[in-house]
Amino acid sequence: MATSNDIKNGTILKLDGNLWQTIEFQHVKPGKGGAFVRTKLRNVTSGKVVDKTFNAGAKIETATVDRSEYQYLYQDGDDYVFMDNSTYDQITVPGVVVGDAANFMLENQNVTVAIHEGAPLYIEMPPSVVLEITYTEPGLQGDRSTGGTKPATVETGYQIQVPLFLEQGTKVKVDTRTGDYLGRVNE
């Protein structure tokens, strides 16, 4: 059994019969009164986000989660198929569990899959990925100096905002947490 002082980002807690992933945490020591830990938790199964406060040192129950490297193979309807890089076993992960990670996953890409008691909980993507722009409107000659943005579709089908000077076929770096354009990649 752990205490609330052990909470870190990514910690999986068991509360009220559900599993919750810590998104944010803050240890607060007010000038008056006892210290506490303020957290933002995401329900692993439903995706619901709640704020919860724990007294400092309060006993909490954490869940054991195995994180392993998997290779994304293909999409099968609403499900996604991954292969364990060490055992070559294939697992099927429901689209609800994959969530927004689907916007940035390419076939044969390595991701981390978190598994609890044999069931996949969530997909951990790298902080950024390189994707190719498959469609965007051409930028107009006069627009290049304004610093504006335009919509662009990347190879996964996800739409991002990119600078006006970028063209179809350009590889760009995209933040997997926010979906924001980070920069152009020269290869």
Swiss-Prot record:
It comes from the Bacteria. InterPro entries: Elong-fact-P_C, NA-bd_OB-fold, Rib_uL2_dom2, Transl_elong_fac_P/YeiP, Transl_elong_KOW-like, Transl_elong_P/YeiP_cen, Transl_elong_P/YeiP_CS, Transl_elongation_fac_P. SUPFAM superfamilies: Nucleic acid-binding proteins, Translation proteins SH3-like domain. It holds the Pfam family Elong-fact-P_C. It is found in: Cytoplasm. The keyword Cytoplasm applies. Pathway: Protein biosynthesis; polypeptide chain elongation. GO terms for biological process: peptide biosynthetic process. Gene3D superfamilies: 2.30.30.30, Nucleic acid-binding proteins. GO terms for cellular component: cytoplasm. Keywords: Cytoplasm, Elongation factor, Protein biosynthesis. One of its GO terms (molecular function) is translation elongation factor activity. HAMAP family: EF_P (MF_00141). Involved in peptide bond synthesis. Stimulates efficient translation and peptide-bond synthesis on native or reconstituted 70S ribosomes in vitro. Probably functions indirectly by altering the affinity of the ribosome for aminoacyl-tRNA, thus increasing their reactivity as acceptors for peptidyl transferase. Belongs to the elongation factor P family. This is Elongation factor P. It comes from Kocuria rhizophila (strain ATCC 9341 / DSM 348 / NBRC 103217 / DC2201).
